[in-house]
């Protein structure tokens, strides 16, 4: 976590104030400031503590099942007839997605800080499930805030959370999606600062959350880099990941940022198209503003009011993005592109039929970008796609959209 970086590196952020260039920071209520500073101090101490690292490593290995595999998607690659596509199989982790990586790190932090109550927000339910899972593992009560719309479209995950002992609180404000759930979680945190740890699920929020979530998720890219060198004897030409808040993406991207030969592509939710407001492509169609404690690219109207946005994928249905992604966009290191709902649905089906792997709708956005890019590349080229989660949670949504009666 603490390797020295070159002065011209893309890995130098954030600074002491939590800024990545003009993005990031700590825009929070005064009551939260002492807690934020306490968390920052606890994290600085923990990441330099060999015992903390050893405990996290043991849990990652024996509980979560790391390292996750880097799998050559031969069927999909041959179908597309271009670059060799590899999947980083985060769907094989305990709880079915990349979310467990961050939750294990943060629950250990909460323990060190003496917190006795866990709160979390969730969109697709994967972070809620992972939070409820680690809370159950360590015997702590867990409250998960989830938009009412998402509660409806992610019923299997709602049941899993309840089964794990968590209390799921539906949020009906706004569109009843991830932004609204995060608002409620922040309100809870402000009123319960003494005993409560807010386990944020994405690489956004006030500093130090974007940094610590990135660090806990960077295991994805660290492993993928080593695995591709073992399997191909070289670095990939392209790496691709879906971006909602951006934790799975920054986890894959960060270890590759200083590899100039590697093209990096983040895939946003283009929804029903960028012309109207039915999308969540904050970097393709938004502008900088402040939300949930940090300055970043946001979907907002002319008055600066945050728009609701839309995506077929509950996990990408967020009108902002982590501040490090905003900085990487402006610095030109990472390309961010939108994928439409129907393109993601097509990729969902194509992956299932060519690979026998049902991907999460979030991951299907990244696969859809691979479907566009791979045929334009030579067969000697190599691409890694982050398969951030499995699609069991999405089969009802997809079934309904395809006109099937499930």
Swiss-Prot record:
The modification N6-(pyridoxal phosphate)lysine is found at residue 99. The keyword Transcription does not apply. InterPro entries: Trp_synth_b_CS (IPR006653), Trp_synth_beta (IPR006654), Trp_synth_beta/beta-like (IPR023026), TrpB-like_PALP (IPR001926), TrpB-like_PALP_sf (IPR036052). CDD domains: Trp-synth_B (cd06446). Its EC number is 4.2.1.20. It comes from the Bacteria. Keywords: Amino-acid biosynthesis, Aromatic amino acid biosynthesis, Lyase, Pyridoxal phosphate, Tryptophan biosynthesis. GO terms for molecular function: tryptophan synthase activity. It catalyses: (1S,2R)-1-C-(indol-3-yl)glycerol 3-phosphate + L-serine = D-glyceraldehyde 3-phosphate + L-tryptophan + H2O. Pathway: Amino-acid biosynthesis; L-tryptophan biosynthesis; L-tryptophan from chorismate: step 5/5. The keyword Manganese does not apply. It holds the Pfam family PALP. One of its GO terms (cellular component) is cytoplasm. Its cofactor is pyridoxal 5'-phosphate. Tetramer of two alpha and two beta chains. Belongs to the TrpB family. The beta subunit is responsible for the synthesis of L-tryptophan from indole and L-serine. This is Tryptophan synthase beta chain. The gene is trpB.
């Amino acid at each position: 976590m603490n390797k020295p970086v070159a002065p011209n590196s893309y890995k130098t952020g954030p600074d002491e104030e939590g800024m990545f260039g003009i993005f990031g920071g700590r825009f929070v209520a005064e009551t939260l400031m002492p807690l934020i500073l306490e968390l920052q101090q606890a994290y600085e101490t923990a990441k330099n503590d060999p015992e903390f690292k050893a405990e996290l490593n043991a849990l990652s290995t024996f509980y979560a099942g790391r390292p996750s595999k880097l799998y050559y998607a031969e069927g999909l690659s041959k179908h597309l007839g271009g670059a060799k596509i590899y999947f980083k199989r985060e769907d094989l982790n305990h709880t079915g997605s990349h979310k467990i990586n961050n939750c294990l790190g943060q629950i250990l932090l909460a323990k060190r800080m003496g917190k006795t109550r866990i709160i979390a927000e969730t969109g697709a339910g994967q972070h809620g499930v992972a939070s409820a899972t680690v809370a159950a593992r360590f015997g702590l009560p867990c409250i998960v805030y989830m938009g009412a719309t998402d509660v409806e479209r992610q019923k299997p995950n709602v049941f899993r959370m309840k089964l794990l002992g968590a209390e799921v609180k539906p949020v009906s404000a706004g569109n009843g999606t991830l932004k609204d759930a995060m608002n409620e979680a922040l309100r809870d945190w402000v009123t319960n600062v003494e005993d409560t740890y807010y386990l944020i699920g994405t690489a956004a929020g006030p500093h130090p959350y974007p940094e610590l979530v990135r660090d806990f998720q960077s295991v994805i890219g660290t492993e993928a880099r080593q695995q591709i060198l073992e399997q191909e004897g070289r670095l990939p030409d392209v790496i691709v990941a879906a971006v909602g808040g951006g934790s799975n993406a920054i986890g894959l991207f960060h270890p590759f940022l200083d590899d100039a030969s590697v093209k990096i592509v983040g895939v946003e939710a283009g929804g029903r198209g960028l012309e109207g407001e039915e999308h969540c492509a904050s970097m393709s169609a938004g502008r900088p503003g402040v939300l949930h404690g940090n300055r970043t690219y946001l979907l907002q109207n002319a008055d600066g009011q945050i728009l609701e946005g839309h995506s077929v994928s509950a996990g990408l249905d967020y009108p902002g993005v982590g501040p490090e992604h905003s900085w990487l966009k402006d610095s030109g290191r990472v390309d961010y592109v939108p994928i439409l709902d129907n393109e993601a649905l097509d990729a969902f089906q194509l992956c299932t039929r060519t690979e026998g792997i049902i991907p999460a709708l979030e991951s299907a956005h990244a696969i859809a970008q691979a479907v566009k890019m791979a045929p334009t590349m030579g067969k000697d080229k190599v691409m890694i796609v982050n398969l951030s989660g499995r699609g069991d949670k999405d089969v009802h949504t997809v079934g309904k959209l395809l006109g099937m009666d499930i």
